[in-house]
Amino acid sequence: SDVCSSDLTITPERGGMITGFTLDGDEYIWTRRPNFSECNRPRFGVPVLFPSCGNPDGGVHNFDGKAYPMETHGFADLCGWDVESVGPDGVTLALESTPLTKFLYPFDFTLLVNYNLEGNKAAISLTVINEGDKPMPFSFGYHPYFMASALENVDFDIKCATCSENAKGEQPAAPEKITLTRKEGADNTIRLLTGVQFPMTFTDKGNGHKVTVDADETFDKGVLWQQDAENFVCMEPWNGWANSVNEEGRHEVLDVDEAMTSEWSITIEKV
């Protein structure tokens, strides 16, 4: 029949993230074990990145003249999230600031992430609320790990303005065709994209997977990444670069009591 069956798995206690997305029993999300059951940063699934993406210069954010240590990709992926609601419109999880998060990031906030399964599409929204008494700077993004048979089998269809391996300095214009290849002797490979015209898509001729990442205008950056001989490729929508929160005019700022919602989606197909 033409009716496909899909399942979306969310693990609130592991960073409030997607940990599985299957189509007719075929898994599209890659899981790293034993990392799944450890308490360190999840390097699998679909981590939520907040209040920053990547690693800021010196591993710190500077707020009001004081340096605050920051984990790679922020801390939302290290926290257990609370289940706010479960219903026909999907699952909503919440993460609120605590004394521990304020040690890293001196702001009061609530994050709400909603996951909704629409056939073979997972629709995801993130609402950031400033609950404090001062303007709140941040960036956000997601770090999805998708199953891949082998890097050389993965063919990307992406339109963007620039493409490089380092976000610092002048960014070279993107080639006509975006590719992700490994340099001799390197253990990983990365592409940092700006001016992305979503959706980003890849097709894997080895496992027959086609994955589409679409995103609203709050995202204009993309990251492609692959490491070791692992069977995954990351195709990630980002709102900021590693040091954006430290750089004037390069991050989001919410005024007191303001909120912002961003939306994106993952669509999985068999080809």
Predicted region positions:
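Asparagine-centered strand-capping/turn motif at beta-strand->loop junctions
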Residues: 10, 126-132, 226-227, 268
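Beta-strand-rich interaction surfaces with strong enrichment in secreted/lumenal proteins
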Residues: 112-114, 189-190, 249-254
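Extended, loop-rich substrate-binding clefts of extracytoplasmic carbohydrate-active enzymes
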Residues: 66-119
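Acidic-aromatic substrate-binding/catalytic surfaces of carbohydrate-active enzymes
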Residues: 9-66, 234
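Glycine-rich active-site loops that engage anionic ligands at enzyme catalytic sites
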Residues: 204-242
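Short Pro-Gly-centered flexible turn/kink motifs
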Residues: 61-69, 253-270
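Active-site/ligand-binding surface loops and adjacent short beta/alpha elements
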Residues: 135-137, 144-217
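Short, small-residue-biased leader/transition segments that mark boundaries at the very start
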Residues: 2-5
